[in-house]
Curated annotation (Swiss-Prot):
Disulfide bonds: 52-86, 90-207, 250-281, 292-322
Annotated family: Belongs to the peptidase S1 family.
Organism: Pongo abelii (Sumatran orangutan)
Cross-referenced CDD domains: CCP (cd00033), Tryp_SPc (cd00190)
Subcellular location: Secreted
The protein's name: Haptoglobin
Free-text domain note: The beta chain mediates most of the interactions with both subunits of hemoglobin, while the alpha chain forms the homodimeric interface.
UniProt keywords, alphabetically: Acute phase, Antibiotic, Antimicrobial, Antioxidant, Disulfide bond, Glycoprotein, Hemoglobin-binding, Immunity, Secreted, Serine protease homolog, Signal, Sushi
Transmembrane feature ranges: none
Region feature Interaction with CD163, mapped onto this chain: 259-264
Amino acid sequence: MSALGAVIALLLWGQLFAVDSGNDVMDISDDGCPKPPQIAHGYVEHSVRYQCKNYYRLRTEGDGVYTLNSEKQWINKAVGDKLPECEAVCGKPKNPANPVQRILGGHLDAKGSFPWQAKMVSRHNLTTGATLINEQWLLTTAKNLFLNHSENATAKDIAPTLTLYVGKKQLVEIEKVVLHPNYSQVDIGLIKLKQKVPVNERVMPICLPSKDYAEVGRVGYVSGWGRNANFKFTEHLKYVMLPVADQDQCVRHYEGSTVPEKKTPKSPVGVQPILNEHTFCAGMSKYQEDTCYGDAGSAFAVHDLEEDTWYAAGILSFDKSCAVAEYGVYVKVTSIQDWVQKTIAKN
């Protein structure tokens, strides 16, 4: 085969072939399949189909099939020469959480059930949580980002002081952090990684919801490396199941924490959470399971049974309850989703 004769090499039927100037397919491998036999009054059309690896899916308006035209261009009927992309699958853990896997002490052991869970370590070795929402971005709380920093710290000051792990203690490098413009009332920040993380059984983003899953009574799952009953950070990822609580009851429980002029807060944990239209509460279960210091930044993960997909309904903001208070407080993802999408697109 001359250099002028072969203009493109392609993979057909699992084997390498070449297309010459006459649009004829020639087998250029040593042990390849023979080319298809000819038929009367017909011809062989050369086409390829793009497919994605495990844990990725094809994103295209076409069907992924491209045909070689007379001008030696690979064309899809719907999108022309625009190539498809492989995007990460979200919210489809290989080993989803099983509510029967209860262990004594209230927390539940997680074995790959929450591949979106990241572990963030701030200055002075304080552990907090973060949630992977695509291959390169994570959500966490603004309070987590400001740990051991003054209120005057900037995002550029904060980013180099953080250490982040995904999957099975896989260290990833942080490029930047972005704080919500109203982070004093909307306790949220974004983390951008320097490189996209490969998605696999242990590392997978959770999906962002298209509707509000924070309905009273709905059960969600919260994972994390927060402190245990002995007030020590756990070495193993744990999770709990918690129901969404009535917001009015939650506000009454914290006794006026939304009214700044009250001088004597009466929170059962001595700290007042942010409670407003951007938050919801989840109640402690009858097994006295709860979130605790270090769990903030983790997702309130809801399993949509119809879609068999896991969504982040909220991000844990107030993790100080530790089975003392009845409610943890979460930032609604639907309240911040526009900001998240615009920030990611801008950066």
